[in-house]
Amino acid sequence: MSSSPVKRQRMESALDQLKQFTTVVADTGDFHAIDEYKPQDATTNPSLILAAAQMPAYQELVEEAIAYGRKLGGSQEDQIKNAIDKLFVLFGAEILKKIPGRVSTEVDARLSFDKDAMVARARRLIELYKEAGISKDRILIKLSSTWEGIQAGKELEEQHGIHCNMTLLFSFAQAVACAEAGVTLISPFVGRILDWHVANTDKKSYEPLEDPGVKSVTKIYNYYKKFSYKTIVMGASFRNTGEIKALAGCDFLTISPKLLGELLQDNAKLVPVLSAKAAQASDLEKIHLDEKSFRWLHNEDQMAVEKLSDGIRKFAADAVKLERMLTERMFNAENGK
């Protein structure tokens, strides 16, 4: 006998409830972890790819990327760079087999202050996806939300029809500049903002709605909706499910497999907290930012300045680790070391 509709409804997981008013995205490079949670989209970053590339399950992809780098030839540096681009695309292509939507693939964080290099690298990634038979409509290119990154996003969207996901976003200034650039999606971070406040203030714990990361994303969401920006707001970097529930109703939320699992086991009732209608009532005023005013406003936010630079360094460090890993596999093995 099937359970009654009332009981079924009561037992609906927080994850299923969340999916009714927010697009759920899986934040992982481990595509075997995606099946269980049935997300719409998925996001990757250099740290996630580095972690996945060290798992036994994914060594075939690593070998394929290495073979590709060798085949293209050139200097050792060129071969490594081509192998890494290919590895990111191979992971993205496998993830796309498991989701109906889009995957985000990140441009090397070491290019975060070079607009033209970011544009070139993004176009290269899209070309590799095309070679794999994947349309650019299923890809979001992730770029750091520096001034240069935001302008690279604007150029990619306007001139090349390449959709961008602006990441490492911590300040209201970054969010406003991204909206004005007309990028497809932003990833304002939640947990890393909380981390900063816990480390740098006397307050060590917060209720979800008072969480500084939650408040930051709420303000950005309300601003975008009040002034009818089309850019999607995708909350990212969560430390607990309380933060996620406090942002229910946000356009998209990208969530790690661990927290997706917790939401799946949670049967508490979930209600939307954010809404476009409520955003209209916010007292936010529209602002315009050129480069000078962007840099000033962003610089006024100590947390955002520190977390953006820290985030770039961390992603860059993991890119270097990935390079070393591939160098070891590609060249030291050849030399019998």
Curated annotation (Swiss-Prot):
<feature type="active site" description="Schiff-base intermediate with substrate">
    <location>
        <position position="142"/>
    </location>
</feature>
<keyword id="KW-0570">Pentose shunt</keyword>
<dbReference type="GO" id="GO:0005975">
    <property type="term" value="P:carbohydrate metabolic process"/>
</dbReference>
<comment type="subunit">
    <text>Homodimer. Heterodimer with isoform 2. Interacts with KPNA1 and KPNA4.</text>
</comment>
<keyword id="KW-0963">Cytoplasm</keyword>
<dbReference type="InterPro" id="IPR001585">
    <property type="entry name" value="TAL/FSA"/>
</dbReference>
<keyword id="KW-0539">Nucleus</keyword>
<keyword id="KW-0225">Disease variant</keyword>
<dbReference type="GO" id="GO:0048029">
    <property type="term" value="F:monosaccharide binding"/>
</dbReference>
<feature type="modified residue" description="N6-acetyllysine">
    <location>
        <position position="321"/>
    </location>
</feature>
<dbReference type="GO" id="GO:0005737">
    <property type="term" value="C:cytoplasm"/>
</dbReference>
<keyword id="KW-0007">Acetylation</keyword>
<keyword id="KW-0597">Phosphoprotein</keyword>
<comment type="similarity">
    <text>Belongs to the transaldolase family. Type 1 subfamily.</text>
</comment>
<feature type="modified residue" description="N6-acetyllysine">
    <location>
        <position position="286"/>
    </location>
</feature>
<feature type="modified residue" description="Phosphoserine">
    <location>
        <position position="237"/>
    </location>
</feature>
<dbReference type="InterPro" id="IPR013785">
    <property type="entry name" value="Aldolase_TIM"/>
</dbReference>
<comment type="function">
    <text>Catalyzes the rate-limiting step of the non-oxidative phase in the pentose phosphate pathway. Catalyzes the reversible conversion of sedheptulose-7-phosphate and D-glyceraldehyde 3-phosphate into erythrose-4-phosphate and beta-D-fructose 6-phosphate. Not only acts as a pentose phosphate pathway enzyme, but also affects other metabolite pathways by altering its subcellular localization between the nucleus and the cytoplasm.</text>
</comment>
<feature type="short sequence motif" description="Nuclear localization signal">
    <location>
        <begin position="1"/>
        <end position="10"/>
    </location>
</feature>
<dbReference type="GO" id="GO:0005634">
    <property type="term" value="C:nucleus"/>
</dbReference>
<feature type="modified residue" description="N6-acetyllysine">
    <location>
        <position position="269"/>
    </location>
</feature>
<protein>
    <recommendedName>
        <fullName>Transaldolase</fullName>
        <ecNumber>2.2.1.2</ecNumber>
    </recommendedName>
</protein>
<dbReference type="GO" id="GO:0004801">
    <property type="term" value="F:transaldolase activity"/>
</dbReference>
<dbReference type="GO" id="GO:0005829">
    <property type="term" value="C:cytosol"/>
</dbReference>
<dbReference type="GO" id="GO:0070062">
    <property type="term" value="C:extracellular exosome"/>
</dbReference>
<dbReference type="GO" id="GO:0009052">
    <property type="term" value="P:pentose-phosphate shunt, non-oxidative branch"/>
</dbReference>
<feature type="modified residue" description="N6-acetyllysine">
    <location>
        <position position="115"/>
    </location>
</feature>
<feature type="modified residue" description="N6-acetyllysine">
    <location>
        <position position="219"/>
    </location>
</feature>
<keyword id="KW-0808">Transferase</keyword>
<keyword id="KW-0704">Schiff base</keyword>
<dbReference type="InterPro" id="IPR004730">
    <property type="entry name" value="Transaldolase_1"/>
</dbReference>
<dbReference type="Pfam" id="PF00923">
    <property type="entry name" value="TAL_FSA"/>
</dbReference>
<dbReference type="GO" id="GO:0006002">
    <property type="term" value="P:fructose 6-phosphate metabolic process"/>
</dbReference>
<feature type="modified residue" description="Phosphoserine">
    <location>
        <position position="256"/>
    </location>
</feature>
<dbReference type="InterPro" id="IPR018225">
    <property type="entry name" value="Transaldolase_AS"/>
</dbReference>
<comment type="pathway">
    <text>Carbohydrate degradation; pentose phosphate pathway; D-glyceraldehyde 3-phosphate and beta-D-fructose 6-phosphate from D-ribose 5-phosphate and D-xylulose 5-phosphate (non-oxidative stage): step 2/3.</text>
</comment>
